[in-house]
């Protein structure tokens, strides 16, 4: 399961709701080195990320907020091997595409909300880098527009749906033979 969206679009909130509704869902904790939040990550060093990259052990890596993040094959496989449905949080279309090489039925979900909602949610949760979150919202919008034919299973406006409604829509998509297809991204992001 891939939840793609800008900061404040509800990735954490909807993941929490998914895990509340079904015990087999689990947040995939990306590797992280650098400042900022630590909850929801496996903290490591840049040296360990580099070593995994050289060994072909990474599906994707990126930098944002002065930190480095990575999705490792071994960590993802370990979660799947326990019978869990991994929920990956993504902020780049390239990352959502890169992890698709991992052999799993990927449900690809765009979570979207307007800029003012991202800003209000960021302030509401006490982020000290609201400006960086707003900048990332713009980057995510541009990323989506640059890849508007990228296939997605669902697009959800999280400012128009409750977390429970969003989670149930995702569960339905996972349970159904839903396939990813191009969506009207320009209409979604305005």
Predicted ranges, named:
Residues 87-91, 102-124, 156:
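Conserved phosphate-donor/acceptor-positioning beta-strand/loop module used by diverse small-molecule
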Residues 3:
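Hydrophobic anchor at the beta1->P-loop junction of P-loop NTPases
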Residues 6:
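P-loop (Walker A) phosphate-binding loop of NTP-binding proteins
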Residues 12:
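Walker A/P-loop
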Residues 30-86, 90-93:
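ATP-dependent small-molecule kinase phosphotransfer cores
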């Amino acid at each position: 399961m891939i939840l793609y969206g800008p900061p404040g679009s509800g990735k954490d909130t909807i993941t929490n709701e998914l895990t509340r509704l079904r015990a087999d869902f689990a947040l995939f904790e990306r590797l992280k080195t650098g400042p900022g939040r630590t909850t929801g990550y496996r903290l490591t060093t840049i040296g360990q990320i580099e070593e995994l990259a050289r060994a072909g052990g990474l599906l994707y890596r990126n930098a944002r907020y002065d930190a480095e993040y990575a999705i490792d094959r071994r960590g993802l496989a370990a979660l799947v091997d326990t019978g869990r449905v991994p929920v990956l949080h993504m902020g780049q279309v390239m990352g959502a595409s890169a992890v698709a090489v991992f052999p799993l039925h990927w449900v690809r979900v765009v979570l979207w909300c307007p800029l003012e909602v991202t800003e209000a949610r960021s302030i509401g949760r006490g982020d000290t880098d609201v400006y960086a979150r707003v900048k990332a919202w713009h980057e995510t919008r541009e990323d989506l527009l640059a890849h508007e034919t990228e296939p997605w299973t669902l697009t959800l406006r999280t400012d128009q749906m409750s977390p429970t409604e969003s989670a149930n829509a995702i569960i339905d998509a996972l349970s159904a033979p839903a396939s990813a297809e191009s969506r009207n991204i320009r209409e979604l992001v305005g």
